[in-house]
């Protein structure tokens, strides 16, 4: 036993040395510097060092001794600062530093990020954890200045021996993954400084008695706890984790689609083997315990490829296998058809050459993949559809796996809500929503020429607007397929702009057959759009995603397609200059707003567009804007109004802006019982009625009709459905959260029992009093209903229902009612907040 242990320890150290050598060989010069100095920065907390934070910051890495390069850095630093005593510490809060993910694997390149686990002793206070987190954030900024993407994750040594109640934050997967994350760590971890990882020494036959075996090693003096970190063992992954992991990988697919496809199919392969799943970490450990040196079975990415290849072959899915191979190639390889770069290690190229030869790829396919930097919108649209369908296929299969095995998800309700809404914002295809197609697939989709062609009603093609990436010259456009179609032009221009096709250098052409739009106004609209919205905008925060979405930036474009004033040529227009009403103008009482186009960014970071045309365009646009605002919403950060009228442009713009501001103020007014805004629109009069739970519009034929309507109980159009035995006053704070298009659940446990308030998509409410069941089971049942019974298929056949209901608790704080996100009430739940913990950000 002792001899074998000695052999494994020596093999562990040698393998870690080879991994470190390989990792450094794939890094840039600055990447090498950051990597080698990390232990120094976290071992010491000194004002001379980057990342210094004042206070009782946990630092000090067990058994860390600076190597020659690190010692030279410390000496130079102290000498330059005239620091005579050098750097010292007596703290030993950090058990070890480890990289995970692509580092040292075939998936690493000079641009790969560094994902670092900072494993610390258990029991650190919340205040000290926050200081350590702040120190890590400072070090990430220091690395960013050197062009290195550095992510830290704080891991208490007992993390994987407890129930996972961590919250998602940034790159952290929170409760979405737990033991799956440990599996990924064990198969990819590389020791940077501190204690070795004990799990690699435990034979597979002892996995079911892991703790007993490990305790025996320490008790009999075979190993010292001062040298080895035990994060725990596992002989299987709970099936409950697969659903949360599928959601997490879909989310990661927004930025890293190729890697996400590999990992999603891996989760699918794991579930296919359930309950006798052969984990990749176990495969890697078995090879390590019985063989010497580096091998592809010790490479995280090669292991993944091998596993998913065997799985897809076993189910006969050769189409996805081909996609998986392309994803692997694009994630890993710089391009075999390009000349070898001097700094590129030979082993990566040799291994990829062997794989490509085995796959039987043609030189043409290699050339196409290797020139991804030159891909334009057609290639990107095809790739986007393929990647998204593959991710959705894995997601569907994992849902079916959970249904077959009657499995409840382990991810907590708050995290599942946040993740599902991140996916909803990124992937859900909805009318008017601008879908971003370039998931880091190609660097530049800009086009020198873009043409917008209108087809009127009565033609062979569908009436509306078509976008082409060519000029209107017959030789350029005849026989070409359009890129996109829509019924209104603002959606097409927005799609081209936010996907990077439309730039200030693009030449925009117009072929108009029926609208009042002319080329100068189209060019001005393009400038107005780009001047108002940046192409890239911040990601939605978890806090925003835990609440109903709100309009953040709103641009309103008047008379872009239909301009009533453009038809005044040769007419005498009589009006009172002192009392001109642009909504009921002149002797003919004409509304000078013929069309309204809305482009807005909401708090979930979606870009939405809407188009209104006709006699009621103004009230339709107003009620739509107001319907996007719940009672307690913040007013939009920015509202811009643009007008393209041939006449009275400034007057129309100013008056509409005033009307919008007035209506928003009424919608968000506090303590209102009932407010009404009357509006003359052409020859008609309308009443806009503002209530806590929504806004409604009614055409008013006469004064009697008006007074009848404002005195009528509006519950006829906002019905309140109570339980059959009791009536219940609805807390006002529930009304405040009313937001159309979203089902919301509120749990009220202030009195004996639990009352449940449910707001549906139309802001109707149902109340269930004295609910006696288990809230966690209710939440899981509702989520399962949405993901299973409500499967919807888009035109492309893709599953696309991510807008799961949010769940809230009503609590009383200092005498005031507040709404907080509902979190699982599991037996080991700790109500105290936690410092940022683990992530699954792997390179």
UniProtKB/Swiss-Prot annotation:
Q: Which gene encodes it?
A: cya
The name of this protein is Adenylate cyclase
Residue span of region Catalytic: 1-537
**Catalysed conversion reaction:** ATP = 3',5'-cyclic AMP + diphosphate
Native organism: Aeromonas hydrophila
Q: Which GO terms describe its cellular component?
A: cytoplasm
Q: What's one GO MF term for it?
A: adenylate cyclase activity
**Sorted alphabetically, which keywords does the UniProt record give?**
ATP-binding, cAMP biosynthesis, Cytoplasm, Lyase, Nucleotide-binding
Q: Where is this region: Regulatory?
A: 543-843
Q: Does the keyword Glycoprotein apply?
A: no
Q: GO:BP terms for this protein?
A: cAMP biosynthetic process
One Pfam family, short name:
Adenylate_cycl
Keyword match Cytoplasm: yes
Q: Where is coiled-coil annotated?
A: none
């Amino acid at each position: 036993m002792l001899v074998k242990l000695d052999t494994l320890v020596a093999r562990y150290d040698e393998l870690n040395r080879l991994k470190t050598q390989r990792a450094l060989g794939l890094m840039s010069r600055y990447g090498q510097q950051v990597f080698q100095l990390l232990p120094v920065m976290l071992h010491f907390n000194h004002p001379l060092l980057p990342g210094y934070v004042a206070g009782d910051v946990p630092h000090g890495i067990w058994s860390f001794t600076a190597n020659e390069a690190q010692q030279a850095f410390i000496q130079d630093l102290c000498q330059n600062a005239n620091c005579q005593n050098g750097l010292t510490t007596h703290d030993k809060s950090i058990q070890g530093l480890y990289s995970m993910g692509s580092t040292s694997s075939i998936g690493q390149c000079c641009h790969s990020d560094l994902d670092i686990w900072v494993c610390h002793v258990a029991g650190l206070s919340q205040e000290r954890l926050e200081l350590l987190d702040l120190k890590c954030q400072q070090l990430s900024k220091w690395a960013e200045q050197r062009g290195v993407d550095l992510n830290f994750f704080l891991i208490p040594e007992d993390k994987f021996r407890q129930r996972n109640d961590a919250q998602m934050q940034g790159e952290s997967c929170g409760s979405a993954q737990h033991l799956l994350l440990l599996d990924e760590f064990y198969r990819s971890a590389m020791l940077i400084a501190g204690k070795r990882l004990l799990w690699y020494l435990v034979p597979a036959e002892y996995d079911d008695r892991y703790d007993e075996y490990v305790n025996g090693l320490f008790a009999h003096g075979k190993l010292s706890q001062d040298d080895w970190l035990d994060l725990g063992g596992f002989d299987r992954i709970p099936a409950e984790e697969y659903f949360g992991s599928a959601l997490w990988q879909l989310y990661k697919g927004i930025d890293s689609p190729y890697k996400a496809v590999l990992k999603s199919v891996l989760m699918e392969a794991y579930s296919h083997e359930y309950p006798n799943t052969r984990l990749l970490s176990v495969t890697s450990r078995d090879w390590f315990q019985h063989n010497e040196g580096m091998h592809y079975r010790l490479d995280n990415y090669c292991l993944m490829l091998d596993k998913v290849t065997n799985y897809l072959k076993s189910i006969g899915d050769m189409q996805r296998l081909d996609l998986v191979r392309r994803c692997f190639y694009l994630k890993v390889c710089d391009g075999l058809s390009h000349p070898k770069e001097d700094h590129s290690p030979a082993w990566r190229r040799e291994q990829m050459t062997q794989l490509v030869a085995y796959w039987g790829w043609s030189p043409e396919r290699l050339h196409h993949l290797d020139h991804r930097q030159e891909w334009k919108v057609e290639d990107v649209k095809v790739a986007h559809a393929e990647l998204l369908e593959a991710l959705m296929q894995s997601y569907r299969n994992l849902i079916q796996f959970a249904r077959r095995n009657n499995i409840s998800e382990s991810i907590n309700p708050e995290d599942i809500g946040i993740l599902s809404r991140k996916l909803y914002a990124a992937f859900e295809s909805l009318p008017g929503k601008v879908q971003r197609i370039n998931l880091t697939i190609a660097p530049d989709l800009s086009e020198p020429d873009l043409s917008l062609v209108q087809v009127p009603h009565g033609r062979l093609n569908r009436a509306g607007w078509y976008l082409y990436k060519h000029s209107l010259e017959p030789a350029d456009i005849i026989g070409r397929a359009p890129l996109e179609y829509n019924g209104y032009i603002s959606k097409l221009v927005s799609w081209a702009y936010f996907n990077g096709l439309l730039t200030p250098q693009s030449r925009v052409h117009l072929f108009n057959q029926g609208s009042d739009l002319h080329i100068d106004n189209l060019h001005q609209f393009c400038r107005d759009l780009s001047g108002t919205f940046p192409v890239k905008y911040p990601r939605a925060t978890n806090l925003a995603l835990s609440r109903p979405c709100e309009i953040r930036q709103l641009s309103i474009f008047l008379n872009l397609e239909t301009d009533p004033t453009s038809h005044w040529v040769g007419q005498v227009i009589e009006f009172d200059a002192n009392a001109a009403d642009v909504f009921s103008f002149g002797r003919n009482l004409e509304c000078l707003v013929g069309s309204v186009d809305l482009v807005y960014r909401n708090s979930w970071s979606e870009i939405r567009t809407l188009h209104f045309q006709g006699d009621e365009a103004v009230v339709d646009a107003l009620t739509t804007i107001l319907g996007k605002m719940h009672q307690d919403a913040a007013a939009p950060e920015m509202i811009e109004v643009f007008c393209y009228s041939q006449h009275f442009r400034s007057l129309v713009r100013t008056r509409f802006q005033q009307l919008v501001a007035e209506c928003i103020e009424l919608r968000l007014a506090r303590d209102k019982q009932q407010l009404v805004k009357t509006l003359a629109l052409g020859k008609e009069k309308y009443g806009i009625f503002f209530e806590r739970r929504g806004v409604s519009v009614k055409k008013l034929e006469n004064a009697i009709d008006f007074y009848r309507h404002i005195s009528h109980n509006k519950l006829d159009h906002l019905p309140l459905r109570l339980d059959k035995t009791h009536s219940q006053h609805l807390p006002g704070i529930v009304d405040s959260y009313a937001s159309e298009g979203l089902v919301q659940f509120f749990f009220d446990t202030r009195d004996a029992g639990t009352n449940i308030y449910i707001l549906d998509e139309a802001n109707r409410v149902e109340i269930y009093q004295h609910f006696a069941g288990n809230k966690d089971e209710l939440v899981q049942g509702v989520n399962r209903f949405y993901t299973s019974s409500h499967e919807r298929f888009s035109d492309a056949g893709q599953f696309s229902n991510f807008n799961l209901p949010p769940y809230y608790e009503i609590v009383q704080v200092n005498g005031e009612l507040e709404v907080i996100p509902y979190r699982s009430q599991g037996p080991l739940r700790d109500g105290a907040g936690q410092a940022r913990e683990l992530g699954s950000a792997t390179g």
